[in-house]
Amino acid sequence: MKFNRIYGLFLRHFFLITRSFPRILDLIYWPSIQITLWGFISNFFASHSTYYNNAVGVILTCAILYDFLFRTSIGFNMLFLEEIWSRNFTNLFIAPIKIGEIIISLVFTALIRALIGLIPAILLTSPLFGISLLDLGIYLFFLFLNLYMFGITLGILVLSLIHISEPTRLAT
């Protein structure tokens, strides 16, 4: 495995993300809307019932963690499918690039995509709802690491199922 090839593929996807304002807006907009929506729903429940007093923090934390898992899996899948849809796979395999190098570059790019959506969501929860996810400390890092690995694994599983079910459509 060559680092230069992995870095080149990473840069290709990174430039596709950063040079397109709609892509960046999509990565930031939906997590922010989800946090705002679940925050206000949680506040409504907490203000109308004593049973849900501590639900705001739990629901917002779960929404952020779920969104990170979802963004990681979707980010990995979309990057791979964009290679297929743009008919770039032939070009990739003409070059001396191995499957492992492609997957590693997609893994790192999926992390960047997930972080672009995660950071604004975490920053919104503190001023709007008084919930800080960073209070979990080092446990938060390990939780995000596990969610990230599960999201990538889920992405690989979904892509393999897509490839098994429709191998001829992906190639054309």
Spans of features found by a protein language model:
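Hydrophobic transmembrane alpha-helices and immediately adjacent juxtamembrane helices
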Residues: 1-165, 169
